[in-house]
């Protein structure tokens, strides 16, 4: 695979000099290139020949960094985002891949000293979100190869495109720091522009007979409607869906390279599930009259990018999910044709909670589509022998747990087909017949599912023990119970702030002085005083006082204690009922505005 022109090659080793009034980013890879000078006063940038001299007044702090992710501008200051720690996790088509282990946000906000107090206060609120952003997980990058494109799309690129800087080759929807790079792009700093994807990257190498086979699984998360589980559901008016992830499985052996791509994404019409302290908030379809147009736009985009599309819907046909399932099926009746097909498979009804081997029923229904649309294959000379002509699009409600089990099954079946085509497997041979290979392959998909799930829900994937071990385990069931409780807590009491941080980082919310300095509308009624920790404290204390008073009813003042017991019980029940009836108000909700566009 050809890579970027050496003239546009990224700096792989950098040294950061933190002076009181400026940041200097010095290439430390022996290239002799210019240094990047960034003002800590106004965030202006320029290239300089060498690092300025230090003295007793200007003593710099020096550290190694591994890339410049970008810059964000808030009300008064700007903030530089850099990679301070990373680890190599494998290779993509022969090129090293690294995972971001630590992000650091560096303020360029000295001008804030002269700002009005109200502006300083607002700046502090926004900068707190950046500390949340520093904890972003699942970020990967390469200095040499474009991670945003699949193997097939990389192969189809022309020589002229391959000579461009990596950021210019990148697929914008999978470029996690697309918005943050804009300032650096404007300053023509190509060698400092590090493209980053969010998703997962896992690989392993194993021997099958005399052959060494390398298997890679890479996920690319779309940034168009990125967010948290409960605050990003369904689609927007442009047809971009929540939790859209492209998963590519690559096998390399004896010079052959073969890949197979699948996608997942939320049901492509407008629906929501707003948290309200209940375990399963009800589903609501929004603007149902727009559903057909939105779904049509979504699938036309998929067809343009991937070819034929088979939409596999895994949601329940009954209960709360049933309404969404019915709407999806109705919408698809107007869209399906030769190139777009829809198939419903009630995962829970057919497989229950333990019989996931029944997914073979689904495979029998989609096998024809997979055979017809195939996979991508290059021979030892780098010549294209096959190309993938279509894609399976899977979804459940979250596009996490059921989806990951299903995608791992499809990936396994297609890998066996690829290995037979390359000549590694015989006609009747399967992955299961090679125990070491089978074990590593299960772990590969389980880790993939966990990482995608953590980014969207905050916890590892449910049902992951089946993917990891091939069957359900008692430990896996207990782990799923704990993860479900954690999801409940995060959804209700943490994800609103996390959603704001995501929107800020990816440019879905642009900070503007004219808007963000305007007076905040005064909250009225219950919303002005709603505070869940305080309400919980009142409920618990009321319960405690009611219990203590009840214990004293046998004393001389039993009527008095009985009265207080009933009083505290009433307060306890009343507060609990108030919180339950107004659950949405007591939850942690996003505070920023609509996405741009």
UniProtKB/Swiss-Prot annotation:
Annotated membrane-spanning segments are 528-548, 559-579
**Recorded topology in the membrane:** Multi-pass membrane protein
Q: What is the deletion mutant like?
A: Short, bulged and branched root hairs. Accumulates elevated levels of PtdIns(4)P in roots.
Query: Does the record's keyword annotation contain Transmembrane?
Result: yes
Annotated tissue distribution: Ubiquitous.
Residues forming the SAC domain are 130-458
**Gene Ontology cellular-component terms listed:** cytoplasmic vesicle membrane; cytosol; endoplasmic reticulum; endoplasmic reticulum membrane; plasma membrane; plasma membrane of cell tip; plasmodesma; pollen tube tip
Where would I look for the motif Phosphatase catalytic core in this sequence? Answer: 393-404
According to its UniProt record, where is this protein mainly located?
endoplasmic reticulum
Query: Could you tell me the EC number(s) of this protein?
Result: 3.1.3.-
What InterPro entries does the database record attribute to this sequence? SAC_dom
Q: What is known of its domains?
A: The phosphatase catalytic core motif (or RXNCXDCLDRTN motif) from the SAC domain is found in metal-independent protein phosphatases and inositol polyphosphate phosphatases.
In terms of PANTHER family, this protein maps to: PHOSPHATIDYLINOSITIDE PHOSPHATASE SAC1, PHOSPHOINOSITIDE PHOSPHATASE SAC7
- Name of this protein: Phosphoinositide phosphatase SAC7
Q: Which organism is it from?
A: Arabidopsis thaliana
């Amino acid at each position: 695979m050809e890579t970027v022109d050496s003239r546009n090659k990224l700096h792989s080793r950098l040294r950061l000099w933190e002076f009181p009034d400026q940041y200097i980013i010095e290439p430390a890879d022996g290239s002799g290139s210019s240094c990047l000078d960034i003002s800590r006063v106004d965030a202006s940038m320029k290239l300089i020949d060498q690092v300025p001299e230090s003295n007793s007044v200007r003593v710099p702090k020096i550290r190694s960094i591994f890339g410049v992710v970008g810059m964000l501008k808030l009300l008064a200051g700007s903030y530089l985002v850099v990679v301070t720690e990373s680890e190599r996790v494998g290779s993509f088509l022969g090129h090293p891949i690294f995972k971001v282990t630590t992000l650091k946000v560096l303020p360029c906000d000295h001008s804030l000293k002269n700002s009005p107090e109200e502006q300083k206060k607002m700046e502090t609120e926004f900068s707190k979100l950046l500390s949340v952003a520093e904890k972003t997980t699942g970020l990967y990058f390469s200095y040499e190869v474009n991670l945003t494109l699949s193997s097939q799309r990389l192969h189809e690129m022309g020589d002229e495109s391959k000579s461009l800087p990596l950021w210019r080759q990148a697929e914008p929807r999978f470029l996690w720091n697309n918005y943050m790079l804009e300032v650096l792009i404007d300053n023509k700093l190509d060698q400092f522009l590090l493209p980053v994807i969010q998703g997962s990257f896992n690989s392993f190498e194993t021997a099958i007979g005399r052959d060494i086979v390398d298997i890679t699984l890479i996920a690319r998360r779309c940034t168009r409607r990125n967010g948290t589980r409960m605050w990003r559901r369904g689609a927007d008016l442009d047809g971009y869906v929540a939790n859209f992830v492209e998963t590519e499985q690559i096998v390399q052996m004896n010079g052959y390279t073969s890949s197979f791509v699948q996608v997942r994404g939320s049901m492509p019409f407008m629906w929501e599930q707003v948290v309200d302290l209940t375990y399963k908030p009800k589903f609501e379809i929004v603007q149902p009259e727009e559903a057909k147009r939105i779904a049509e736009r979504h699938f036309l985009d998929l067809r343009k990018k991937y070819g034929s599309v088979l939409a596999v819907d895994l949601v329940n046909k009954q209960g709360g999910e049933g309404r969404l399932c019915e709407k999806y099926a109705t919408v698809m009746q107007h869209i399906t044709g030769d190139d777009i097909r829809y198939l419903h498979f009630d995962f829970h009804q057919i497989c229950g909670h333990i019989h996931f081997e029944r997914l073979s029923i689904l495979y029998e229904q989609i096998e024809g589509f997979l055979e017809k649309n195939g996979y991508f294959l290059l021979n030892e000379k780098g010549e294209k022998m096959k190309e993938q002509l279509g894609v399976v699009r899977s979804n459940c409600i979250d596009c996490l747990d059921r989806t990951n089990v299903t995608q791992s099954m499809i990936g396994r079946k297609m890998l066996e087909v690829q290995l037979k085509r390359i000549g590694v497997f015989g006609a009747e041979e399967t992955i299961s017949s090679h125990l070491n290979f089978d074990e590593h392959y299960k772990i590969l998909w389980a880790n993939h599912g966990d990482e995608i799930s953590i980014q969207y829900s905050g916890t590892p994937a449910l049902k992951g023990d089946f993917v990891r071990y091939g069957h359900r385990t008692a430990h896996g069931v207990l782990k799923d119970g704990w993860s479900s409780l954690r999801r409940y807590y995060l959804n209700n009491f943490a994800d609103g702030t996390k959603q704001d941080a995501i929107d800020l980082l990816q440019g879905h919310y642009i900070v503007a002085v004219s808007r963000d300095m305007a007076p905040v509308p005064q909250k009225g009624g219950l919303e002005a005083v709603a505070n869940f920790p305080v309400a919980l404290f009142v409920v618990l204390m009321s319960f405690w006082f009611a219990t203590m008073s009840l214990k004293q009813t046998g004393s001389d003042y039993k009527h008095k204690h009985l009265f207080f017991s009933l009083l505290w019980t009433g307060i306890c029940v009343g507060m609990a009922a108030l919180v339950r009836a107004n659950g949405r108000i007591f939850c942690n909700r996003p505070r920023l505005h609509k996405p741009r566009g």
